[in-house]
Amino acid sequence: MRKNFYKYLTSLFKNDNRTVILLGDIGVFSLKSAFDHDPSRAYNLGIMEQSMIGAACGLSKSGFIPFVHSIAPFITERSYEQLKLNLGYEKVNSFIISVGNSYDYAGLGCTHHCPNDLRIVSSIPNFKTYCPGNSLDVQEIISKNLETQCPKYIRLSEVENNLTSLQSNYEDLAELHYNQNGICIVVGNAIKDIVSFINSNPNYTIVYTYNVSDFNTEKLNSIIDKGGISKNITVVEPCSDSGIISKIATSIKNIESINSISVPKMFIEKYGKKENIDKYLELDDNSIIEKLSKIYEH
């Protein structure tokens, strides 16, 4: 996802002179072609995330489209006040692109973990927040929002789902499988091998989204009503509760049950690789599907 984002951003940078790149000491080598093309619009500001966001505000007000890129906890938790005042309050066209979510940097410990990023940024008015599941999602989000006059937050991950082959008619809330027994909402890359998951013919409807801040509750209502689907709802997320569950709870009438499968509220004191932490938290594909089977076993 990150590698393909760099390719896409480089192409955008070379074809749109409004694009400015601000890096937090990551991605410099991968974006070398952009730096060489026009060094006046590409900057590595080091570990100065708060300053990067202030610069992004000024650049946006001057007619540029800044892309701020750094590691999730440093660009969201450390820089919350700047996100709120410089970008949210000013409602400027800008992109915050993070890496390391939720615990992609599993070997570096809690300082580099950030499962709460979407909930943190979604709490700021005027921000749009996205949890892409693959590289196609990332490109789709950026291209659709390039002219949107508000700040956008996009979390990148080292792991993609394999949904791209199914996305010929792209939607931000797509029904992938139908069954009346209930409905499972898969957010971003929460389930990596989602194609096999769909092909296993589970006894509940599966819908997919990457859109957190503007989660399409109207479309969800339509899917449920049109299909006569039981309102046993489960949200599966690759992060801590992003707020989608609250949107559903206040928008869908007569819910029978609502469940969350997400990163728990805890310090993760295990080390290793992302897949090790997934298994430890029972958020690997097999564990998630087993949990869903128990929820919809009737």
Feature locations, PLM:
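Thiamine diphosphate
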Residues: 1-155, 157-298
